[in-house]
């Protein structure tokens, strides 16, 4: 198979965890899905943070009291950690899905997030989407990222990890279905 998340069983050892608190804490585990509407078919996973090219339309995650995930990235020039909210703890207005309610496998998209004016989907127009699985490792959460000499410090301050395999652009074309399934 081309996925490392078969049956949502993704687990990857975090090479940066040296002193795990327990035997499971050195692993990233599957946490949820993020689904983006893309501007066009050539938008790639590297463009997901660019609102001119990708917009988050759906999010769900496992039920486990993890609602939002923030990674800390070290700025090599300034020498400071910058927090980046990778997964929001709330559902934004107009977005579908849930926070910490369990994984959902079916949802409706009714709005074009790139539309200027009326946002309702247009029949027979092609829309593009990308689904991204992501993982989480609680041990990567260090409340004091600068105290690297602390014996409890471990990891890189990056509890969020994005899926890297089997990422594809999917197209969808809305249309009336009355004529299908024996309709008249």
Where are the predicted features?
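Extracellular/surface-associated beta-sandwich interaction domains
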Residues: 1-184
């Amino acid at each position: 198979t081309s996925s490392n998340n078969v049956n949502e069983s993704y687990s990857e050892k975090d090479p940066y965890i040296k002193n795990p608190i327990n035997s499971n804490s050195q692993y990233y585990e599957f946490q949820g899905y993020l689904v983006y509407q893309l501007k066009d078919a050539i938008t790639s996973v590297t463009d997901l943070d660019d609102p001119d090219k990708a917009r988050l339309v759906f999010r769900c995650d496992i039920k486990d009291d993890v609602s939002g995930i923030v990674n800390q990235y070290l700025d090599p020039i300034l020498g400071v950690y910058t927090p980046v909210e990778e997964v929001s703890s709330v559902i934004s207005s107009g977005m579908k899905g849930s926070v910490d309610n369990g994984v959902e496998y079916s949802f409706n998209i009714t709005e074009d997030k790139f539309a200027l004016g009326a946002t309702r989907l247009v029949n027979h127009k092609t829309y593009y989407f990308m689904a991204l699985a992501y993982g989480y490792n609680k041990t990567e959460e260090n409340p004091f990222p600068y105290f690297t000499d602390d014996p409890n410090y471990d990891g890189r301050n990056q509890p969020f990890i994005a899926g890297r395999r089997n990422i594809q652009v999917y197209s969808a074309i809305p249309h009336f279905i009355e004529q299908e399934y024996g309709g008249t």
